């Protein structure tokens, strides 16, 4: 679903109010679910796992999804924790040297 939010909120040259609302609201809902999952946990499944590796790259495009991570304090904490990992920093720069967006 976040891929659709990317497309309709950031890349789509043809505006669609329906699609922007539909996928924008769904992105907000998914961040809310993730925020709840992270209550009392450092990572999605407790320890750093493939779940975090799969979700974090989508969350790293929060700006494309028009999501304010400050509205999701547990996601923000999790996002920053993963963004500070050396392997994540190195991987984020492939194929082009770029900075990880930090809210």
Each predicted region: which residue ranges?
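GST superfamily/GST-like fold recognition
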Residues: 2-6, 43-71, 76, 81-82
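Terminal-tail/helix-coil boundary detector
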Residues: 88-103
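Surface-exposed helix-capping loop/turn segments at secondary-structure junctions
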Residues: 36-47, 87-91
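Generic alpha-helical secondary structure signal
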Residues: 17-21, 25, 70-76, 86
